[in-house]
């Protein structure tokens, strides 16, 4: 027997407020207190409440325009995803409107309002921030939203297309162990980023099983940049840390670490191995040749768009999708332990 969907009246009853207050909260009314807003969002997530979008879809003709919010346009990873998404949309006769925004930023709601104001049919958000569920909650009854990224495990009801980040972390640990490394660093952890956190957890778990020790150097910023990698790299070498391998949270961080290694006259990979994640175009250049993981941007773009188009159909876009495994790309920055091991 099918379970009857929860209604806005039931959410209002549990929150001890009126239906109008719940509606105003979900629509982002600034007059609702933060305490009440948090409680209503919690109840909606807990009970799977989501307004029926069918009426909106049937009453408004589709524009053929898709919105996409990129977390960081300065990051080549997102630029490459944007290109792949635009190509996928073009093949379907669709256009894409891009803007930049981070779920934890104060102006994030303005980005969604901007896209809605331009009558996009739906939105793809590239983000793995823990703040995503709360940031999009006021809008999920107004427009379909698909997340290209990793969400907290408890948020399984949000349409998402995600990488198998934990398996990538495990694979990284096994690879470095196979080369002979027993002491490693996870460089640039952002604990608010669910994708990176899962990579770290997979790396840490596999390393523990293999008997490897792992040191963690945390990224204090909201984005993963070469500047962060450079500063963490300088700290690593200045403190004379003895780990023989580094798994960087992103290729940008890895490239910054590589610059610091050269400044300290440390050879990669002869003295220390370096493994990245993202396979940005710069990682393949002849003077870098970074060993890394490819997140398969074309596949992510295709599946994100397909999921969004499914969400535009009555009853579509429900259920979880299989995780997409990244592809390991071996180049020239990892080798068996060298001088540092000696």
Please tell me what each predicted stretch does.
Residues 119-127, 185-187, 219, 240-250, ...:
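Periplasmic-binding protein-like
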Residues 160-186, 201-205, 226-236, 254, ...:
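Hydrophobic alpha-helical segments within soluble ligand-binding/sensing domains
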Residues 89-100, 204-227:
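Short beta-strand elements in bilobed, periplasmic/extracellular small-molecule ligand-binding domains
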Residues 215, 234-342:
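Flexible loop/turn connectors
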Residues 103, 125-170, 212, 252, ...:
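Flexible loop/hinge segments that line or gate small-molecule binding clefts
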């Amino acid at each position: 027997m099918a379970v009857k969907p929860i209604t806005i009246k039931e959410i209002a009853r549990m929150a001890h407020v009126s239906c109008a207050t719940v509606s105003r909260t979900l629509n982002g009314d600034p007059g609702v207190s933060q305490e009440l807003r948090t409680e209503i969002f919690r109840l909606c997530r807990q009970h799977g409440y989501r307004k029926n979008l069918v009426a909106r879809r049937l009453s408004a003709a589709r524009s053929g325009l898709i919105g996409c919010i990129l977390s960081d346009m300065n990051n080549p990873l997102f630029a490459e995803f944007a290109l792949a998404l635009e190509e996928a949309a073009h093949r379907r006769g669709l256009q894409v409107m891009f803007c930049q925004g981070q779920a934890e930023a104060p102006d994030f709601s303005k980005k969604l309002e901007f896209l809605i104001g331009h009558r996009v049919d739906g939105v793809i958000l590239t983000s793995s921030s823990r703040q995503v569920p709360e940031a999009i909650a006021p809008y999920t009854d107004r427009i379909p939203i698909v997340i290209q990224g990793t969400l907290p495990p408890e948020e399984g009801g949000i349409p998402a297309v995600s990488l198998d980040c934990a398996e990538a972390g495990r694979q990284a640990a096994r690879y470095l162990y196979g080369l002979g490394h027993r002491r490693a660093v996870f460089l640039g952890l952002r604990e608010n980023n669910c994708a990176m956190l899962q990579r770290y957890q997979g790396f840490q778990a596999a390393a523990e099983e293999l008997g490897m020790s792992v040191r963690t150097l945390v990224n204090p910023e909201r984005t993963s940049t070469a500047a962060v990698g450079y500063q963490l790299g300088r700290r690593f070498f200045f403190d004379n840390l003895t780990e023989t391998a580094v798994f960087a949270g992103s290729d940008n961080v890895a490239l910054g670490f590589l610059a610091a290694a050269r400044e300290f006259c440390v050879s990669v990979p002869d003295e220390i191995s370096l493994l990245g994640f993202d396979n940005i175009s710069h990682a393949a250049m002849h003077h870098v040749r970074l060993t890394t993981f490819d997140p398969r941007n074309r596949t992510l773009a295709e599946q994100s768009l397909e999921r969004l188009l499914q969400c535009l159909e009555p009853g579509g876009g429900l259920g979880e999708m299989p995780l997409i495994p990244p592809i390991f790309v071996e180049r020239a920055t990892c080798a068996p332990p060298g001088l540092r091991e000696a």
